[in-house]
Regions:
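Glycoside hydrolase catalytic-domain groove-lining segments
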Residues: 169
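Metal-dependent phosphodiesterase/phospholipase catalytic core, i.e.
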Residues: 5, 10-166
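Short, ordered coil/turn segments that flank beta-strands lining enzyme active or ligand-binding pockets
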Residues: 2
Length: 169
């Protein structure tokens, strides 16, 4: 977010999975997209999350649960950790966290250190140790090398690779 709070969202933009266009009309960038980093957490909490749509607003997965009439918020990473911890306590299970650092190079170009923000939350919830239930994954190899070399996060790390990279497409 604009105020440096890590949120749980698949994309760095909001228009395909929220009602951002109807709430914050005119806040898109020149490319027509609404970037999460341009909104404070308070603003993002005003949005309703929904199933993915295409740019025309048509459901990408029309047979999935629509959530019509329900206000689903975009959670912060801290809220998600609290949810997982509460479920684990209630069920006696050990569900973990699989965190993707989404486009850290983009965030860096915007003056934000995504990795540092995520580390701060993980530190608050004692998730930095050698714990296989907390995983960090990323497409950016430079960021994953930083995760390894700084030695702060000791859990598993996963290098993501695009199909185009593997197949040379």
């Amino acid at each position: 977010t604009a105020d440096g709070i890590p949120i749980v969202l698949h994309d760095v933009t909001l228009e395909l999975t929220t009602n951002v266009e109807s709430i914050f009309e005119g806040r898109q960038r020149d490319d027509g997209l609404f970037y999460a980093i341009d909104f404070t957490l308070a603003e993002i909490k005003r949005l309703t999350a929904h199933e993915r749509t295409d740019l025309s607003g048509k459901a990408v997965f029309p047979d999935r649960y629509s959530g019509d009439g329900v206000h689903f918020e975009i959670p912060t990473l801290a809220e998600e950790i609290e949810l997982v911890d509460a479920l684990n306590a209630k069920t006696g299970k050990c569900a973990g966290l699989y965190i993707e650092l989404k486009r850290p190079e983009f965030h860096e170009s915007e003056g934000a250190d995504l990795y540092a923000s995520v580390l701060q939350v993980l530190r608050e919830y004692d998730r930095l140790g050698d714990n296989p239930e907390t995983v960090i994954q990323c497409f950016d190899p430079v960021t994953l090398k930083r995760v390894q070399s700084d030695g702060i996060f000791k859990g598993p790390r996963v290098q993501l690779i695009l199909t185009e990279t593997i197949l040379g497409m």
